[in-house]
Amino acid sequence: MPSIYVNIFLAFIFALLGMLIYRSHLMSSLLCLEGMMLSLFILITLTALNMHFTLSFMFPIVLLVFAACEAAIGLALLVMVSNTYGMDYVQNLNLLQC
């Protein structure tokens, strides 16, 4: 396995560990999710370029679209929670309160 794949995989693991460690604040969780999506995007792009399979070139773009949607929804949720409660703790996101 080339070292670039190991580095990208380690970046994904570190972002996942950051998500598990800093899960109390919503902003930290969103940044870790973006790091995970970025490492997945690079990994899928490198794999598609190395495989020379024409149909696999659309997978990184689809992942990028989903990452942009996730970021937009996450930032909207962050603005809503910070305006309502004045802080960005994840514990304020109780979905049972409606």
Curated annotation (Swiss-Prot):
Keywords: Electron transport, Membrane, Mitochondrion, Mitochondrion inner membrane, NAD, Respiratory chain, Translocase, Transmembrane, Transmembrane helix, Transport, Ubiquinone. Its EC number is 7.1.1.2. It is a multi-pass membrane protein. It is an enzyme of class 7 (translocase). GO terms for molecular function: NADH dehydrogenase (ubiquinone) activity. InterPro entries: NADH_UbQ_OxRdtase_chain4L/K, NUOK/Mnh_C1-like. It comes from the Eukaryota. Pfam families: Oxidored_q2 (PF00420). GO terms for biological process: ATP synthesis coupled electron transport. One of its GO terms (cellular component) is mitochondrial inner membrane. The chain crosses the membrane at residues 1-21, 29-49, 61-81. It catalyses: a ubiquinone + NADH + 5 H(+)(in) = a ubiquinol + NAD(+) + 4 H(+)(out). It is found in: Mitochondrion inner membrane. Gene3D superfamilies: 1.10.287.3510. Core subunit of the mitochondrial membrane respiratory chain NADH dehydrogenase (Complex I) which catalyzes electron transfer from NADH through the respiratory chain, using ubiquinone as an electron acceptor. Part of the enzyme membrane arm which is embedded in the lipid bilayer and involved in proton translocation. Belongs to the complex I subunit 4L family. PANTHER family: NADH-UBIQUINONE OXIDOREDUCTASE CHAIN 4L (PTHR11434:SF0), NADH-UBIQUINONE OXIDOREDUCTASE SUBUNIT ND4L (PTHR11434). Core subunit of respiratory chain NADH dehydrogenase (Complex I) which is composed of 45 different subunits. This is NADH-ubiquinone oxidoreductase chain 4L. It comes from Lepus europaeus.
